[in-house]
Amino acid sequence: MTDRDRHATITKDELMARLSSVGAYKTGVAAVRPVPDDVMNHYNEWLKRGCHAGMTYLENHLEIRRNPELLLPGAKSIICCAFNYYTPPSDSGTPEKPVGNQLKWACYALGDDYHEAIRERLSKVTSWLTETCGHECRICVDTAPIFERYWAVQAGLGFIGLNRQLIIPGAGSRFFLAEILTTLPLEADSPCTLSCGSCHRCLNHCPGHALNTQTSKLEIQNSKLCLDARKCLSYLTIEHRGDLPDGVKLGSHIYGCDECQDICPHNCNSPATTITEFTPRPEILKLTTADILAMDRHTFSTLFCHSAIKRTKLAGLLRNATYITQLTHIN
């Protein structure tokens, strides 16, 4: 008898209940297997076209992306989780509906850093799972080389929209995705087979036209849309280093962009998050371009210490504020 045999067994329902208790809005399970060739071919073509812009790390670990078992030898199941980060609009304004000259921040970034918050919550579940049944686990929160949205579809959480976001039917796309790879064999859920249908609102609403570059009707029908990061305001304001390309118009987008989500009809009735860590911080919402342009490294580090906004670094935030200020003066 092995150590694993001496441990108690748990049911899938018990595991899903545990995940719900730590804040997961929706969960599902997919069996670990290599990613199909057509998915890998589409991804490699996207890389070949340079649509990943300066995110060269996306070129790494292709074999691991193809076969998630390389992340955890012996893995049998991928437990996919969606965590709601959305806070509805209020009279004082939000990132989606700012008041006056309020800057636009990506909604997901206004609370605590989701990497830290979600990993801490999921660790409670993986510790319980390992102690209870002796199986190994690995938590992935947006940093491991794994096709998160593909596996979320396979686990039945939702479908990938034309804006390349995972859309949960009846709830929308304002969710963080995370996974638990485990050696515990679990019954897989049925993949989600829904699509955007005839709705193309996001394609024309994208301010940088990043969603409809070289897109054929067949690609739209097959949801093989190519998002060109070189034109995406989220990439340009967060990941891009150095000066912004000529012709970029940020408007009031200081960090990220939610335009393709705001226009999506699936987000009309997005539920409010119950996770306190994702509540928008007032000290961030009230920032002006003048406040940002006056920031030094200490102020930046203190304000964004436990925030995803630190990703852009002080230089990136100063650059964005400068561009917005210059555009305001021109207009």
Labelled PLM ranges:
Residues 235, 242, 246-331:
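Alpha-helical scaffold domains
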Residues 166-191, 226-246, 296-301:
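Short, charged low-complexity linear segments at domain edges
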